[in-house]
């Protein structure tokens, strides 16, 4: 079986770390053990520096990061990760499990920020070509639930400090995109934890079995 790229998406506090652990456990039970893990923005030395610039509220002092500058920094970090880590790993037969990918930009910047969606799609295609995840697990949670969980973890980053309206727009765009793409599977992350974990296990198991069919 050819190696695959699985991405976990969702608002802050959706439970992406727990989901990643469940995905790994499920893949291992299915005999898949050669995996690497990525996060966006980040995952390479350069991409981590860009992560600090775009997320650390103190990194640029009083200077306001414009919406378009934010988008371009996300894409700079993304293409560096894709070209230097993800594609080489897949070519070597290693599965890649990612914490966020391009769907985040389409939802956060296209939905939350209200940036023109055609422009974002054009930029994505110019930077990434036809490269896409094989499977995306979107953990759907309301901003009220997600941000309560995120705030319980401690200090929030620059984007986590946005308004509920921002996150409602982001969630709406996530759901819209998920409805348009069969490779995106929506998981109700407001359920009890064990139910969420069971849904992830079932989704991943069925998907891998279909690959073997």
Swiss-Prot record:
Which parts of the chain span the membrane according to its record?
Answer: none
User: SUPFAM superfamilies recorded for this chain?
Assistant: P-loop containing nucleoside triphosphate hydrolases
Q: Its domain of life?
A: Bacteria
Question: What high-level taxonomic lineage is stated for the organism?
Answer: Bacteria, Pseudomonadati, Pseudomonadota, Gammaproteobacteria, Enterobacterales
Q: What is this protein's record name?
A: Thymidylate kinase
Q: What is its EC number?
A: 2.7.4.9
In the record, the note on similarity to other proteins reads: Belongs to the thymidylate kinase family.
Reaction equations catalysed: dTMP + ATP = dTDP + ADP
The residue range of the signal peptide is: none
InterPro entries, A to Z: P-loop_NTPase, Thymidylate_kin-like_dom, Thymidylate_kin_CS, Thymidylate_kinase
User: Which residues does the record give as ATP binding sites?
Assistant: 10-17
- Return the broad EC class: transferase
- Cross-referenced HAMAP family, in alphabetical order? Thymidylate_kinase
Q: Which NCBIfam families match?
A: DTMP_kinase (TIGR00041)
Question: What is one GO biological process annotated to this record?
Answer: dUDP biosynthetic process
Q: Which gene encodes it?
A: tmk
Q: Which UniProt keywords apply?
A: ATP-binding, Kinase, Nucleotide biosynthesis, Nucleotide-binding, Transferase
| Keyword Coiled coil applies | no
Gene Ontology terms for molecular function: ATP binding; dTMP kinase activity
């Amino acid at each position: 079986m050819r190696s695959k790229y699985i991405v976990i998406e969702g608002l802050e506090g959706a439970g992406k770390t727990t989901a990643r652990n469940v995905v790994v456990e499920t893949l291992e039970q299915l005999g898949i053990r050669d995996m690497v893990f990525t996060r966006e923005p980040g995952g390479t030395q350069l991409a981590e520096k860009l992560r600090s610039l775009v997320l650390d509220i103190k990194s640029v002092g009083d200077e306001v990061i414009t919406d378009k500058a934010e988008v371009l920094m996300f894409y700079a970090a993304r293409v560096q990760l894709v070209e230097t880590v993800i594609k080489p790993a897949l070519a070597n037969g290693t599965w890649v499990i990612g914490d966020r990918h391009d769907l985040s930009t389409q939802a956060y910047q296209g939905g939350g920020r209200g940036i023109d969606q055609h422009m974002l799609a054009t930029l994505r295609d110019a930077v990434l070509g036809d490269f896409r995840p094989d499977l995306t697990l979107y953990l759907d949670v309301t901003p009220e639930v997600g941000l309560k969980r995120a705030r319980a973890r401690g200090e929030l980053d620059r984007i986590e400090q946005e308004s509920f309206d921002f996150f409602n727009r982001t969630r709406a765009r996530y759901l819209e995109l998920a409805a348009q793409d069969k490779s995106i599977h929506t998981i109700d992350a407001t359920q009890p934890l064990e139910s969420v974990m069971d849904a992830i296990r079932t989704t991943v198991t069925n998907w891998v079995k279909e690959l073997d069919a």
